[in-house]
Amino acid sequence: MIDHTHLRLFQFCDSQFPTGAFSHSFGLETYIQRNIIHDDHTFIAWLKMFLQEQLTYSDGLAMRLVYDALENDDTQKVLHIDKLMFVQNLPKETRVGAKQMGTRMVKLALELYNNPWIAWYHQQMQDKKAKLNPAICFTMLGHYLGVDIETIIDYYLYQNVSSLTQNAVRAIPLGQTAGQKIVTHMIPYIEETRKQIFELKEADFGMTAPGLELNQMAHENVNVRIFIS
């Protein structure tokens, strides 16, 4: 039997879901223009790094901490993590891009569900107490739907892998079949990453690869672009 609560959350993983993810490469485009990424093998190496660094120590760990805060009705903890997610994201384009995606996801979630936590989160943004982040919104939605945190993180990581792969298909370019092979190849790494997230301490939050941040910053100065970040 289909678990409709999981399907409702998985709807937000659809590549056609209008959060703006298709407009962001999060530094990938810089690597492509420098010819560091030029085929499926070099893209997979980059995608593993992005998954095991930025999505582990920032988004994934934040989701685990936010879920615990929701369980304890700790609003101050949620606001603290929202602030950390914004200020530790040093490259301007990725910082602003995450805020834009978070805002779109929150507004769409409010259109679809009467979720008190997301309504509260949106109000905090209007009161200038929160920036809005897609990882936090996704966690709130999963929590509201009664989905366990392990599955919430798996879905979120999958959504990012799928979205970035579709962007790579356009930018490198790759064939659609090659893109689907990459997503299939990455599924075991998604599970490994989720397990790693549950082994981290809160003090590990925000660690990332300097080379990734530098290439995200350098994207501001690329001559020709198809992505915002």
Swiss-Prot record:
It comes from the Bacteria. The keyword Nucleotidyltransferase does not apply. Keywords: Chaperone, Cytoplasm, Nickel insertion. InterPro entries: UreF, UreF_sf. Its main location: cytoplasm. It is found in: Cytoplasm. The keyword Cytoplasm applies. One of its GO terms (molecular function) is nickel cation binding. One of its GO terms (cellular component) is cytoplasm. Belongs to the UreF family. HAMAP family: UreF (MF_01385). UreD, UreF and UreG form a complex that acts as a GTP-hydrolysis-dependent molecular chaperone, activating the urease apoprotein by helping to assemble the nickel containing metallocenter of UreC. The UreE protein probably delivers the nickel. Required for maturation of urease via the functional incorporation of the urease nickel metallocenter. This is Urease accessory protein UreF. The gene is ureF.
